[in-house]
Every structure is written in C-alpha cells, then in structure tokens.
Amino acid sequence: PDDSVPTQLPSESMTTEATTPSQPANPQPVSQKPAQPTSQSVSQSNSQSVSQSTSQPSSQPTSQPINQADSMVGLKIAVAQQQFIVGDVINNAKKMVELAKDARDKGANIIVFPELSLLGYPPEDLLLRPSLASRVKLAFELLYTVKDIVMLVGYPHIDPNGTFNSVAIIHNGQQKGFYHKQCLPNYGVFDERRYFNTGHNQVLFDYQGLPIGLLICEDLWQDAPIRTLKEKGAEIIISLNASPFEQNKQEQRKALLKSRATEHNIPIVYANSVGGQDDLVFDGGSMVVNAQGKIVQEAPRFLQHTLYVVARHDAQSGQVILSEQRKSPLALSQIAETYQALVVGLRDYVNHSGFKG
C-alpha cells in the first residue's frame, strides 16, 4: 500500500563523484537552442505521432525552455541505481524526490531513474487496476515539487490508445515530454506484451545544445532504436533499465554496450535497477560507456548507489567527452555474484512480505 514504509536495501555510503562537478507527441520535430550560455533548454522531437490524450498530468510534450541560474561547464548526470518497491507508488515518488534533491545539491543537472521506477518492476497485473492512473497522478504532483534538476522517471503512461512503458522528462514542476518503449520483451521472465502497447515516438531532447536520445532496456538490445536516434542527431544515449540477474549477465551487458557505443560512435549511460522482487533479483551494475567502448564509470553490484558522470562537448573532436571514475568496483566471481543474488533475493522477499522473526 502507498502509506507503508517498506524495508529498503542498504545504501552504499560512498558515491562515485565525477571530477570537476558543475553546479505522443507532435509529428514534426521541435528544436530550440538556448539564446545565451546561461540558458539551458530541453526540447523534444518525435519521428512519429502518438496520442496526446492522457489521464496523466501534463504529459503532452512541450518545447518550453529550461532556465537555470548557473552556466554549464559540463553536464553532470546522476545515475540513481536504487530499489523501488512494486506498487508502492507514493513512497517511490518520495524517495525520488529526496534522491533528486541530494543529486542537485551535489551539482547534478540530470538524474536518471531505472525503468518503471515509479511503479516498480515487474508490476504485472497492477497495471490492470483502474486506480493506477490516479495514483500515478498523485505521485507526479510530488515529483513536480523538485526544482533545478531534470528528472528522467520510468512510469506507466495510460491514455485512450493504451498503456505504455515510458520515461517522463520532468523539470521545475512540468512534464516536458515523454518516450514510450518500442521493443517489448516477451520471453523468459518477461511478459510485457500482455500489459503494454508498443511505442513509436523516437525522442531526442536538447539540453544546453546537447541532443540526448532516450531508450528503455530492450530497446538497447535491438539495433534499430539506437541507430535511428544517432541518425537523427543524438550525441549521447541514456537508457533506463530493469535488467534482472543471471549468471554472467553483467559481462553480456558490458559486451552489448561496448558494441553499440563503438558501432554508432556514441556514449551510453546505462541505469539499472537493484534489489529483489518476488522471483527476480536485480543486480545493478549501472555503467557509463564512452564512444570508443570504454567503461568510464561503473556502479557496484547488488547495492543501492548513485553514480555521477560529467559529459562535455569537445569543440575540436566534435564528440562528447566523459569523466572517468578514480576506482572501479571489485569484480565478482561467479560464485560470489550467485551468493549475493541469493542473499538479496531471500532478504527482500522476507522484508517485503512483512515476516516477523
């Protein structure tokens, strides 16, 4: 229930600070550039039309500028590898508010949350409840209280055309735009086609002249979405994910990100979920890969953690340069990662179920 306070994973006390911190849609592309260096803007462009009728608040894309007081010496992105409880929409939103404020105070310009983080993953038949839309609306009102940082929030978008696995672009009390997941997995533990409609809106949003492309999990495992974003001018990709643990899965993710980054010559920010939910365990391992396929930032496995990276546009090379972390987390052996998965899965099942003793 929304008024409960679920037991959370222990948070890692240390965050990886990057060096030199800075402080549905219309079918025709919208492009706005800031008029001066101190004006930061977000605008959205879509390749195809989607429904503009929705029960969610302020979900129609806009090109209203984002203005902030300080000029940007680098775009600082916070990757919130955190646990969000399935169905606990209001408390999930409250947690996002606190995380966003903390990231803003550390100089972040954007904070990225995992796939469907507002509702939790996998939500399954909760998506069929008529009350869901009103609960999401209340949660958005909480998110709108955060100022001076862009929030990329995974949420269920519900309108007369269906239910979509989406990401909202939120800033200063407004939803500036949204993106609907295009590739819905329907194999193994995934059953997304039962609940979600396929999205068709390729989304770029502009931040201080830097075109950012958005993807959600399975979109990255297929080549077409990232290829299209690159062709439309994206210079960095941000992907929201709820990728569950399997043995050797982290190595598969790393291989995928390196391949996508080098093939399309574009850096990728990969935000993953963490924690146990019923029969699934999410192992985190969020990371940032540069255009040459090098992992420049990596979060620890099985721990809540906020990762920071600074992206700067290099005038000479024309590429986005990413800050590198000073020390990578220790790699886990297959035995160690399996043990951690068992511990997290059992602990969170007991805690979420409210068992005593």
Task: Label the model's feature ranges.
Residues 1-10, 14-34, 39, 44, ...:
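Enzyme catalytic cores with a strong preference for nitrogen-chemistry domains
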